């Protein structure tokens, strides 16, 4: 049975059989009072000063806990999970330590934290202890139209049209990458040469089968496909830039930098083509521009990183590499030492061999790297007994060197992967909100008939419940405990789509 009571503003007003919250003017006497809390039939007893350490919580605020006071039994009654209250009470006794009991599920314990109003700090402690991903909130634009556009292009899971735009973006990225790879096939290069015949000028580099045509570029099918892809990339980038809530933060985002890198090579190539059309130019200058174009075209391959915007797998890989930078640095350092040692050793071991494939120590660097990574192309091999011994030691040292930091990197990957997958499954538990039961008028009538309260006491209880209802609703409108969350912020951990 739960009976609510009112807001006691006068210290002289009290309840029969309930000395706990009588607002005695002597603070020492008040702090030593005991409070009995009944959790679904299991009674707990603690001191009032223990609960008053956290006055903003449900049990620490006399006004809030009055709603659950039973004057007949002189105790507070809560029809809640009993095992969870051990940790809740210890939270007050320890001054803020919170640890979930092993026999209490995550969703139930998170709901109890919200019910007893322990606060966001306690919830954050619980999330960190349980390995939850820290919820990162990013502001949304204030303008409603910009907000809808931003959600449409930035968060694919926000709506159905946003998913469609994400699918279009991924398709365009794949088309661009496929086109970039196919245009280097000899069959397409031969077709381009036959198509333009002698009307085109071709330039080649020594020891290279790649030739570049310097005329009729704008009629090339691959150039047309590239232009269409760039139109979409540019449109997407401009829309996201115009709709973003902060222009400064927009350009510091790594994904936006990748978008810029994916677009710029096209316009540089286009400007170079137009410049060569308007000048006679010398062959040396054209060869230099071709060398620049080759580097710029290579940058186009980085468009594949645009897929990480829509892929959780790539994001997990990036987090793993970022967390494993120390181990990767040690791996590179160990390989560097091994390459120097074994390339020097194999050079001197093969120095007396007439047909030695190691004319110098720098030439042996490649062999040492290939051997330590256990690839073994076979393009450079030792022929003497000493050289073969050095090669064997090099391979063994490479296996040991690589094997040492790899488990740490794999462990980091497993951590981020399981944290992401478990975070998705458990995210719904963190969003569960539980509103305390507010006694209704029938409850008051029932308690009135079953108790020995006087009419004046009953009227005070009823008036207090009315004030309590108003305070509770007003607070929850501010904190969004029982309503929708702040619509001007979005949790980015829930706005990812797995491709």
From Swiss-Prot:
Residues 1-125 are annotated as: Tetramerization domain. The record marks 381 as: Important for binding with the scorpion mesomartoxin. Its main location: membrane. A motif (Selectivity filter) lies at residues 374-379. Residues 183-221, 276-289, 348-361, 382-388 are extracellular. It is found in: Cell membrane. It catalyses: K(+)(in) = K(+)(out). The chain crosses the membrane at residues 161-182, 222-243, 255-275, 290-310, 326-347, 389-417. A motif (PDZ-binding) lies at residues 497-499. Pfam families: BTB_2 (PF02214), Ion_trans (PF00520). Residues 362-373, 374-381 dip into the membrane without crossing it. GO terms for biological process: action potential; neuronal action potential; potassium ion transmembrane transport; protein homooligomerization. One of its GO terms (cellular component) is dendrite. Glycans are attached at residue 207. Residues 1-27 are annotated as: Disordered. InterPro entries: BTB/POZ_dom, Ion_trans_dom, K_chnl_volt-dep_Kv, K_chnl_volt-dep_Kv1, K_chnl_volt-dep_Kv1.2, SKP1/BTB/POZ_sf, T1-type_BTB, VG_K_chnl. Residues 312-325 are annotated as: S4-S5 linker. Changing residue 263 to T: Causes a dramatic reduction in current amplitude in a dominant-negative manner. Loss of channel function. Causes a depolarizing shift in voltage-dependent activation. Keywords: Cell membrane, Glycoprotein, Ion channel, Ion transport, Lipoprotein, Membrane, Palmitate, Phosphoprotein, Potassium, Potassium channel, Potassium transport, Transmembrane, Transmembrane helix, Transport, Voltage-gated channel. GO terms for molecular function: delayed rectifier potassium channel activity; voltage-gated potassium channel activity. Residues 1-160, 244-254, 311-325, 418-499 are cytoplasmic. The record marks 252 as: Important for normal, slow channel gating. A lipid is attached at residue 244 (S-palmitoyl cysteine). Homotetramer and heterotetramer with other family members. This is Potassium voltage-gated channel subfamily A member 2. It comes from Xenopus laevis.
């Amino acid at each position: 049975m739960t009976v609510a009571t009112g807001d006691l503003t006068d210290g002289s007003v009290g309840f029969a059989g309930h000395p706990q919250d009588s607002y005695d003017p002597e603070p020492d006497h008040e702090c030593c009072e005991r409070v009995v809390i009944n959790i679904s039939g299991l009674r707990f007893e603690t001191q009032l000063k223990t609960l008053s350490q956290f006055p903003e919580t449900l049990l620490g605020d006399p006004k809030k806990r009055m709603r659950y006071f039973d004057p007949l039994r002189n105790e507070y009654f809560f029809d809640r999970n009993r095992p969870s209250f051990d940790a809740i009470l210890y939270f007050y006794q320890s001054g803020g330590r919170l640890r979930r009991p092993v026999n209490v599920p995550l969703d139930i314990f998170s709901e109890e934290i919200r019910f007893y109003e322990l606060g966001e700090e306690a919830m954050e402690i619980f999330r960190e202890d349980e390995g939850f991903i820290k919820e990162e909130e990013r502001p949304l634009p204030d303008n409603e139209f910009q907000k809808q556009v931003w959600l449409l292009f930035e968060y694919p899971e926000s709506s159905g049209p946003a998913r469609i735009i994400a699918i279009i973006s991924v398709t365009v990225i794949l088309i661009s990458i496929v086109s970039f790879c196919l245009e280097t096939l000899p069959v397409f290069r031969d077709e381009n040469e036959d198509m333009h015949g002698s009307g085109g000028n071709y330039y080649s580099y020594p020891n290279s089968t790649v030739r570049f045509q310097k005329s009729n570029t704008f009629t090339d099918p691959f150039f047309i496909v590239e232009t269409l892809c760039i139109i979409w990339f540019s449109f997407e980038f401009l829309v996201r830039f115009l709709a973003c809530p902060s222009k400064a933060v927009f350009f510091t985002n790594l994904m936006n930098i990748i978008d810029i890198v994916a677009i710029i090579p096209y316009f540089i190539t286009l400007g170079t083509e137009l410049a060569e059309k308007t000048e006679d130019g010398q062959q040396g200058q054209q060869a230099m521009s071709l060398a620049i174009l080759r580097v710029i075209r290579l940058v186009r391959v980085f468009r594949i990183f645009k897929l990480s915007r829509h892929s959780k797998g790539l994001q997990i890989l990036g987090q793993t590499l970022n967390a494993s930078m120390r181990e990767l640095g040690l791996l590179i350092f160990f390989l560097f030492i091994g390459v120097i040692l074994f390339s020097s050793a194999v050079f001197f071991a093969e120095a007396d061999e007439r047909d030695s494939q190691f004319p110098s120590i720098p030439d042996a660097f490649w062999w040492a790297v290939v051997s330590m990574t256990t690839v073994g192309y076979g393009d450079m091999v030792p022929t003497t007994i000493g050289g073969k011994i050095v090669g064997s030691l090099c391979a063994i040292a490479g296996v040991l060197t690589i094997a040492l930091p790899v488990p740490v990197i794999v462990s980091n990957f497993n951590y981020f992967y399981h944290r992401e997958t478990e975070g998705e499954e458990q995210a719904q538990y963190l969003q569960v909100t539980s509103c305390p039961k507010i006694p209704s008028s029938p409850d008051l009538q029932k308690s009135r008939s079953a108790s020995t309260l006087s009419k004046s006491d009953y009227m005070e209880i009823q008036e207090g419940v009315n004030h309590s209802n108003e305070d509770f609703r007003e607070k929850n409108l501010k904190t969004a405990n029982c309503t929708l969350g702040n619509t001007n912020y979005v949790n980015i951990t829930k706005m990812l789509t797995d491709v």
